[in-house]
């Protein structure tokens, strides 16, 4: 009977994409996917260290599986991703039953590392590594939409964030390799790609070449133009954008290119300039608002989402109010919110002016209340409208319904048969509008692109 594997993924879209690649490697080695973790011979945890609670959850899982390994020595335990990169050998001292600790840059080398483990070694792979172009096809979770990494790592030095230390410096993939991957996805029947990067609009800064006009030869804007005409791909999304690199040229391209969905995820983190400076974000409140104004000048109905942190060290009530004011001024369609969580080896974690937990929790609740109200109000504009929805799957709560997303990334439910509608762009009249999702009725199958 072949070995079976199970992957538990924490955190961001980058981790989800890495997990798909590692699943592809495991299946190429002859392993099969297990239905449950306790049925697996190889357990892989792809980890996130942005928040402390995800890290604590990991160690809880590892403690349980370490006990299982004492009963079954053939069980292979792997910790991959950002916690693995951050902890390295220390993780083995804490949980000696772990067989392999590997940073995110080693996702494409899982096979050779696993062979070392099966030959009797306990392996730690966290040294800096140049990116390796995908050599094994990922086992993708969807047959309709796909992640495509375009840039790895991060050169920013935000004072609260561990990402540069665990994912390394920016490394952009060559445009030709990116297009080739997208062409292969189109040939397999995929309809939508999401281009991924920690700061995706910083793409190309590390690639050589200057144009006759004196600008960099490779920019994210140029990449969008380069891949846009791949036949069969109907929609192009991207995440995550950094305000520092979000230019008007990029905004114009998004407005001009019909396949590029009019949804933009641009974290702002705080609405106060002093806090932004302490965070080392590299932009001001005014700069952020100018970006949003420019997007809406070119694309009035564009959907905007973002990330925000409350309770950053030193944040006063007045500074928090500026965050609330910015949220109200922008009118976000969705906002990922979090209370500041001190992370190891970051400057902000050592500062003495930490905000008490009770105040952070109060501010988070107040912000979430405002976000839900604004999202609910903005959602009403969809009522009665026709939207084109790319159907992805079955509503897990109602087998008579399918779900998909609009151009603006609104989750939308509609009646229908998944075997008929999966991967189809369906014109839908919206009949219900909730804060973060819609419901509607199909009018006709559509071959329109977004």
From Swiss-Prot:
SUPFAM superfamilies: Radical SAM enzymes. It is found in: Cytoplasm. One of its GO terms (cellular component) is cytoplasm. It is an enzyme of class 2 (transferase). Pfam families: Radical_SAM, TRAM, UPF0004. One of its GO terms (biological process) is tRNA methylthiolation. [4Fe-4S] cluster 1 binds at residues 12, 48, 82. The keyword Cytoplasm applies. Catalyzes the methylthiolation of N6-(dimethylallyl)adenosine (i(6)A), leading to the formation of 2-methylthio-N6-(dimethylallyl)adenosine (ms(2)i(6)A) at position 37 in tRNAs that read codons beginning with uridine. NCBIfam families: miaB-methiolase, MiaB/RimO family radical SAM methylthiotransferase. Monomer. This is tRNA-2-methylthio-N(6)-dimethylallyladenosine synthase. The gene is miaB.
């Amino acid at each position: 009977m072949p070995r079976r594997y199970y992957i538990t993924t924490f955190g961001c879209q980058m981790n989800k994409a890495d997990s798909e690649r590692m699943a592809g490697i495991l299946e190429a080695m002859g392993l099969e996917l297990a239905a449950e973790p306790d049925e697996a011979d190889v357990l892989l945890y792809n980890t996130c260290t942005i928040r402390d609670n995800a890290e604590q959850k990991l160690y809880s899982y590892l403690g349980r599986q370490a006990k299982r390994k004492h009963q079954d020595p053939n069980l292979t335990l792997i910790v991959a991703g950002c916690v693995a990169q951050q902890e390295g050998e220390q993780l083995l001292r804490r949980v000696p039953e772990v067989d392999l600790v590997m940073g995110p840059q080693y996702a494409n080398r899982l096979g050779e590392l696993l062979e070392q483990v099966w030959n009797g070694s306990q392996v730690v792979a966290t040294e800096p590594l140049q990116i390796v172009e995908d050599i094994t096809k990922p086992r993708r979770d969807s047959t309709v939409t796909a992640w495509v990494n375009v840039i790895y790592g991060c050169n920013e030095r935000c004072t609260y964030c561990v990402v540069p230390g665990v994912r390394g410096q920016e490394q952009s993939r060559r445009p030709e390799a990116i297009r080739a991957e997208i062409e292969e996805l189109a040939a397999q029947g995929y309809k939508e790609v999401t281009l991924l990067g920690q700061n995706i609009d910083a793409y190309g800064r590390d690639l050589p070449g200057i144009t006759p006009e004196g600008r960099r030869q490779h920019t994210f804007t140029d990449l969008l133009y380069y891949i846009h005409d791949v036949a069969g791909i109907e929609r192009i999304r991207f995440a995550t954008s950094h305000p520092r690199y979000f230019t008007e040229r990029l905004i114009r391209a998004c407005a001009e290119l019909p396949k590029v969905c009019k949804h933009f995820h641009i974290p702002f983190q705080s609405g106060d300039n002093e806090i932004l400076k302490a965070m080392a974000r590299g932009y001001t409140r005014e700069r952020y608002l100018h970006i949003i104004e420019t997007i809406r000048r070119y694309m009035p109905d564009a959907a905007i989402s973002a990330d925000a942190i409350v309770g950053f060290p030193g944040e006063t009530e007045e500074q928090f109010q500026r965050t609330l004011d910015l949220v109200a001024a922008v009118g976000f369609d969705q906002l990922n919110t979090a209370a500041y969580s001190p992370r190891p080896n970051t400057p902000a974690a050592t500062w003495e002016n930490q905000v008490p937990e009770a105040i952070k929790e109060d501010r988070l609740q107040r912000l979430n209340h405002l976000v839900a109200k604004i999202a609910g109000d903005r959602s009403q504009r969809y009522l009665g409208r026709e939207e084109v929805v790319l159907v992805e799957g079955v509503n897990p709560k109602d087998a008579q319904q399918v779900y998909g997303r609009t151009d603006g990334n609104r989750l939308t439910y509609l009646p229908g048969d998944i075997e008929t509608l999966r991967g189809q762009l369906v014109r839908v009249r919206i009949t219900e509008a909730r804060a973060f999702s819609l419901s509607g009725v199909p009018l006709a199958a559509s071959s329109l692109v977004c």
